[in-house]
Amino acid sequence: QQGGMWIPSLLNGMNETEMTNLGMKMSAEDIYSVNQSSLKDAVPHFNGGCTSEVISPNGLILTNHHCGYGEIQSHSTVENDYLQDGFWAKSYAEELPNEDLEVTFIVSINDVTKEVLNGVDALKTEGEKKALIEKNISNLQKTYKREDWQNVMIRTFYEGNQYMLFVTESFEDVR
């Protein structure tokens, strides 16, 4: 059994058989697909650190209480203690907006290790290697093809042995 982190875009052909043997009922395509709806489209990041779940076609999401605690607290008053009593909007007009809160969906995940490490082997010092990696990442973030409303971020995995580029879409109208 392989341990550690399983990157969704690499499940197909890499971990799918093992996951099926462990009892998984869905396919790797059901978990991650760029071309069809998949689990990645239903589990966005909530405010950069928490997971959330989309549970309606209108964008209703759920997350853990502690993830939205600050926003709940900011809307609470002595008369309306939402932390104690909860809150239920009966219409869209009653929903309470939350400034500086966003929900981010992954559009695609791509392995860009070759591009990030391009030219690094020819360098001798760790400082030179680090500077070139940072330059390559910066160039990729600027030039990677995406829609105007999408963001690109590159994350390192396995202690700098793999680099993955995430194309994301963020929504800031969270109520």
Language-model features, listed with the residues they occupy:
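Terminal presequence/propeptide segments associated with secretion/organelle targeting
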Residues: 1-175
